[in-house]
Design a protein with these regions (language model features):
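Gly/Pro-rich active-site loop or hairpin
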Residues: 139-142, 197, 223-294
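N-terminal pre-domain/capping segments
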Residues: 2-115, 214, 324-364, 376-380, ...
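Active-site beta-loop-alpha junctions enriched in small/polar residues
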Residues: 33-37, 62-66, 94-96, 133-135, ...
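C-terminal accessory extensions appended to soluble enzyme cores
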Residues: 273-274, 282-365, 371, 377, ...
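Hydrophobic faces of well-ordered beta-strands that scaffold small-molecule active sites
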Residues: 28-34, 59-61, 89-93, 128-130, ...
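Active-site acidic/histidine proton-transfer and metal-coordination neighborhood
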Residues: 7, 99-217
Length: 399
């Protein structure tokens, strides 16, 4: 049954069979932000079942408003299911935040965040993502970042306190993942508007100073704030090089969706096909240069799981193209080794071989055209149909 389930999931994922030994492998998880639109039920567990059937393996639970006590039972059931499987659960805190506001505004935001921290443990969340909100009375940079370092240090401590101590086995027997997994990572998300704290540089600086945090790269926000910047695979390579140099590590948590933007500000999410932010360049980067990465991508699109599957299909296509290119290069290398040539010399020889062939074909084609262009000799109008040898007819003769 276990083998059957493994092969069933492989087939559903479009043939993601293990690569040969020795070949570097990237860990990629994809899923929607919330219960799938196509799910007949509306509980988290039913949503997880539907996501798995679609060949996806991650989900982000949205706690846009305060978490109610009656939600906790289904959160715990989802946590048990994710612990027993390879399904990744994540949590998103309140969208509206004012961590840089007045003391009253900050405390109100922190009280909302507390509920998502409690739910994060119940659901076995790998990441709990938070927004910071407006700059308030702070200027971008130094002082604001220092304040947030203090705030998120307290948030991380609180998450670890809620997660509990694995030595206290009796108290936490209902949460077996406490003994096997690390506490949830606190994600700090990049923002999509100029008046909101959250450039990539700001997020990286705070994460660098607070252990237990992780930058959440929202590609739609990055694209909008950069006036439509994320257009090529090189743009993504530059972004992840920046993160690797300034933050380190190989684990990444990202959001992706189409976005409508104006003057450096995100207006609202759209489906990927209707946006100038395309997933193909990102897929190309992941396929070509992402072997060192452990990455989770959450679909924020209004189409949720449909665009998550769309992203998975484009990644598979990019990966297939790369494998074809590698196979061609390996074939060229084998031929070069067999003939005692350098691969570059083999490429030149192939061109030299091809050029005469092409010229021969062209000459044959030209000869055929010349023959076909020969005008037939005119016949006499006389009744005996004898060939006319008049001088005007000889002018048309190719001989």
């Amino acid at each position: 049954m276990i083998l059957f389930e493994v092969f069933r999931k492989l087939l559903l994922k479009g043939g993601h069979f293990p690569r040969p030994l020795g070949e570097p492998s990237m860990s990629l998880k994809l899923g929607p932000a919330g219960v799938p639109l196509s799910c007949k039920g509306r509980t988290i567990v039913e949503g997880m079942d539907d996501i798995t059937v679609l060949g996806l393996d991650a989900m982000e639970v949205q706690t846009v408003r305060t978490v109610q006590p009656h939600h906790f039972d289904q959160y715990w059931q989802a946590g048990i299911l994710s612990w027993k499987s390879d399904f990744e659960m994540n949590m998103h805190g309140p969208y509206y935040a004012e961590l840089l506001g007045s003391k009253r505004e900050r405390n109100r935001t922190l009280s909302k965040m507390e509920a998502s921290m409690q739910a994060g443990k119940l659901v076995n969340a790998r990441h709990i993502t938070y927004h910071v909100g407006p700059y308030g009375d702070y200027e971008p940079g130094g002082k604001a970042n220092e304040e947030l370092v203090n705030i998120f240090s307290g948030v991380v401590d609180r998450v670890r306190s809620i997660w509990g101590d694995e030595k206290e086995e009796e108290e936490y027997s209902a949460f077996p993942w406490v003994h096997e997994a690390e506490p949830s990572l606190v994600g700090i998300e990049t923002s999509g508007r100029q008046e909101l704290w959250g450039t990539v540089e700001e997020v990286l600086e705070v994460c660098n100073h607070v252990e237990g945090t992780v930058p959440v790269l929202n590609m739609a926000h990055k694209h909008a704030r950069g006036h439509g910047r994320m257009r090529t695979s090189e743009d993504y390579a530059e972004l992840f090089d920046q993160v690797r140099e300034n933050y380190g590590g190989s684990k990444f948590y990202c959001h992706f969706a189409g976005v409508e933007h104006r003057m450096g500000n995100a207006l609202h999410y759209t489906q990927i096909k209707k946006s100038d932010l395309k997933f193909e360049p990102f897929a190309e980067f992941l396929a070509e240069e992402g072997d060192w990465m452990d990455i989770t991508i959450i679909s924020d699109s209004p189409l949720l799981e449909h665009d998550a599957m769309y992203m998975l299909q484009h990644y598979d296509k990019a990966r297939q193209r790369l494998l074809e290119i590698r196979a061609r290069d390996e074939r060229k290398l084998r031929l070069a080794t067999h003939h005692g040539l350098d691969p570059e010399e083999l490429g030149i020889d192939e061109q030299e071989i091809l050029i005469p062939k092409v010229s021969d074909v062209d000459s044959k084609h030209k000869s055929t055209n010349d023959i076909s262009n020969i005008n037939p000799k005119k016949t006499s109008n006389k009744a005996n149909d004898m060939i006319s040898f008049e001088e005007k007819n000889d002018d048309d003769d190719i001989f």
